[in-house]
Amino acid sequence: MTQAKDHAMNIGVFIPIGNNGWLLSENAPQYMPSFDLNKQITLKAEQHGLDFVLSMIKLRGFGGKTEFWDHNLESFTLMAGLAAVTSRIKLYATAPTLCLPPAIVARMASTIDSISNGRFGLNLVTGWQRPEYAQMGLWPGDEYFGRRYEYLSEYAQVLRELWETGRSDLKGEFFQMEDCRLSPRPQAEMKIICAGQSAAGMAFTATYADYNFCFGKGVNTPTAFAPTVERLEEAKAKTGRDVSSYVLFMVISDETDEAARAKWEHYKAGADAEAIAWLGLQGAADTKSGADTNIRQMADPTSAVNINMGTLVGSHATVAALLDEVVTVPGTGGVLLVFDDFLKGLDDFGTKIQPLMRSRRHVTGEALAEVA
């Protein structure tokens, strides 16, 4: 097994802003999103020395027996609340760019920067699920699928101009600024995340973003995402910018490999077929963006019970060793984790998995147990 002795890994948590987290299963924990739950999760992440938390935005769910993602909080207001009760951990909100003008998002980000004393960053999404926006009369038509990164490029230019200079006069196809002002500006450099996996998404990330988020792939195959990172490296070569990749994984751990595998099989056995079918229909709606989009992977029937993110299943020692392999892929800066049970999962991660990870020695500062 590859050992990550010389690689340091940053770790974040994809907090459950929507009901039931990331498992479309009747056999998984069923819960509603709340500020209190996400506060507990974020404080645990901070306590265990994790680096950041990110919340998504979801404006309409998938239905089914579990009402998957039918119940969601709003990302910016949630992160503003979390900014006020944390002291060290970095916080990222997600901007639904079809709903919010860039000048408003720039000001909201600057406000949370003030609340957090410089610990805030922004995830930009173009919008891929038509019903989220059509319900509000904001869907621009299906031709948008083919032009969404042109739209997002102008959006990001407005953000950068306002944050860096306090003023934008951008005259584009989608946005026309006229002496648009922002003050106060953020006290810290505002980092941008993008999770686009299409060729256009990669080109956008290499030009405007600081981090690229991509899906891990498979079960206990921690480096199978490497071709995705290689595509970003090719895009970066054209822009010369420093952009690192962060990889999304679900952790399902227990005291033994067998116990963890039993949980995973139980979740799969309770898969919410109706919600999964809805996800597939939404993925098929985009005929413009090519085969490499996130939604294509999410809707793949192979492991749709957790939207086909990379899954690490095993004992705490097994998961630690698998995570150490992730960061050996060149261009990888860290991981974004979700858990089947967030509160217990985070405590187990902090006390039983992280201390075994060579890639987290800079956090634990402990002599690590030998991982077979």
UniProtKB/Swiss-Prot annotation:
Keyword 4Fe-4S: no
Positions contributing to FMN binding: I57, K58, N123, E132, R148, Y149, S198
Substrates-to-products reaction catalysed: uracil + FMNH2 + NADH + O2 = (Z)-3-ureidoacrylate + FMN + NAD(+) + H2O + H(+); thymine + FMNH2 + NADH + O2 = (Z)-2-methylureidoacrylate + FMN + NAD(+) + H2O + H(+)
InterPro entries in alphabetical order: Luciferase-like_dom (IPR011251), Luciferase-like_sf (IPR036661), Pyrimidine_monooxygenase_RutA (IPR019914), SsuD_RutA_monooxygenase (IPR050172)
Keyword hit for Mitochondrion: no
A Pfam family of this chain: Bac_luciferase
Alphabetic keyword roster: Flavoprotein, FMN, Monooxygenase, NADP, Oxidoreductase
Signal peptide: none
GO MF annotations, alphabetized: alkanesulfonate monooxygenase activity; uracil oxygenase activity
GO process annotations (BP): alkanesulfonate catabolic process; nitrogen utilization; uracil catabolic process
EC number: 1.14.99.46
Function summary: The FMN-N(5)-oxide reacts spontaneously with NADH to produce FMN. Requires the flavin reductase RutF to regenerate FMN in vivo.
Family: Belongs to the NtaA/SnaA/DszA monooxygenase family. RutA subfamily.
HAMAP family cross-referenced by the UniProt entry: RutA
PANTHER family: ALKANESULFONATE MONOOXYGENASE (PTHR42847), ALKANESULFONATE MONOOXYGENASE-RELATED (PTHR42847:SF4)
Protein known as: Pyrimidine monooxygenase RutA
Organism expressing this protein natively: Methylorubrum extorquens (strain PA1)
Gene: rutA
